[in-house]
């Protein structure tokens, strides 16, 4: 009997309340579709999934999403979920491949990928596949499968990999051909104008320019830091005092960082 697949892994996470559409990044992601791969790598709290989820919602191209976890280090499970995510866009893409991926004993997972690659190669329109939280699935076997997919990537497919760490896959050749869009921490940090729009438009805090500049400097544009500061500021009567005291040792920031550390253990 085939192991059931969790359907919720096949949908982009809902955007946070009052999430801001970051037009600068939306435009870069649109332009990245001209290449084969978009690689979004940054530590926790940089809003990677939020940015990509917002972009996918507005993307005119059919888009498949797969949220990965530690269980997907099993190459057969990875291949099964990869197939299911593509089937969520077009059932014919995974026609027969899902049964192969879930068969026990089954063929090597590369066989499943070959089936998918061949079906994708016959597709007329472009398709986007997003692999979120790739760091959880990363390992020698799954990295080899991803490298195989990239090496044999059919023209209609644009692949987006979201990870806290740079995947151990060979990308030099694609980069030399201008086929990779790289988005890292510096790209994902809030620019000064984005900070202003987030605090005073999305969060409706009504801060002065000096207050915004001070908070931007203290968080260094870190999206999670700004989010935590904004939530706390909404409950403060003295914004200036709070901003002066807000650092990485602030209670909410400590809770966030502690949770991230525990999740890595």
Role assignments for model-derived ranges:
Residues 22, 49, 82, 132, ...:
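Generic structural signal for small/hydrophobic residues in well-ordered secondary structure
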Residues 38, 136-141, 146-182:
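Sensor-1/coupling segment of RecA-like P-loop NTPase cores
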Residues 2, 120, 175-176, 180-185, ...:
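Loop-to-helix "switch" segment enriched in basic
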Residues 70-73, 136, 165-168, 188-189:
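Conserved nucleotide-binding/hydrolysis micro-motifs of P-loop NTPases
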Residues 43:
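P-loop (Walker A) phosphate-binding loop of NTP-binding proteins
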Residues 185-211:
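Conserved small helical "lid"/interfacial subdomain of P-loop NTPases
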Residues 46, 50-127, 134-138:
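Conserved phosphate-binding/catalytic loops and adjacent sensor/switch elements of nucleotide-binding enzymes
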Residues 1-29, 95-101, 192, 197:
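Conserved adenine-nucleotide phosphate-binding loops and their immediately adjacent elements
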